Curated annotation (Swiss-Prot):
GO terms for molecular function: metal ion binding. Residues 97-171 have a biased composition (Low complexity). Its main location: secreted. This is GPI-anchored hemophore cfmB.
């Protein structure tokens, strides 16, 4: 079974080589793999192969891996020539363009990732600073409120103290007056008693 598969691949490679005599040997396996999987009836049916939009994208990466720059250029020329002869001309990207595009894409992706990471880090720092400032502001507000309450209590006590003193003074004055009135009444009673005794004796 393995021998039959190998023979089939070699036969297909021979057909591809015969159909594309200017194609380097390093690219034959690439052509066999791509042309045998695109749905066309045979490997040599380039009128069909060249109408497949995926032809170039399927063959190019394999050729870039297997062949050097000079051989890649030869493959591009051979494919363009063969498809033009089959009545279905195609265009092939310049050799090295795909690699350059892939490199630029990777660089752009990396830059975007770094930018996103930097933005996320800045946002995190900003959020942390805001969170740290909020408790400090709350503490300051609480301290100010506590100080205001203490001052208000002190002022209330201070204002109440004179009133207490006034009340004490009033009470003392009332007691004194009451005492004086009692003394006067006692004196008057004494005088009346003496007068009554004198009248009795007379």
């Amino acid at each position: 079974m393995h021998f039959s598969r190998t023979s089939l691949i070699l036969f297909a490679a021979g057909l591809a080589s015969a159909q594309l005599p200017n194609v380097p040997g390093c690219s034959l396996d690439c052509f066999v793999a791509a042309l045998s999987a695109d749905g066309c009836s045979s490997l040599t049916d380039f009128a069909c192969h060249c109408q497949k939009p995926e032809l170039v994208s399927n063959i190019t990466p394999c050729v870039q891996s297997a062949c050097n720059i000079a051989d890649q250029s030869s493959v591009s020329v051979a494919v363009v020539s063969q498809c033009s002869a089959a009545g279905h001309p195609i265009s092939v990207p310049p050799v090295g363009a795909a690699s350059t595009t892939a490199s630029e894409t990777a660089t752009t992706t990396e830059s975007s990732t770094q930018t996103t990471t930097g933005t996320s880090s800045t946002a995190s720092k900003t959020s942390s600073s805001a969170a740290s400032s909020t408790p400090s502001s709350s503490s300051a507000s609480s301290s100010h409120h506590h100080s205001s309450s203490s001052a208000l209590t002190t002022r209330t006590l201070t204002s109440t103290e004179p009133s207490s003193q006034s009340t004490s003074a009033s009470a003392a004055a009332t007691t004194t007056l009451s005492g004086n009135a009692g003394s006067e009444k006692a004196n008057v009673a004494g005088v009346v008693a003496v007068a009554a005794a004198a009248l009795y004796l007379l």
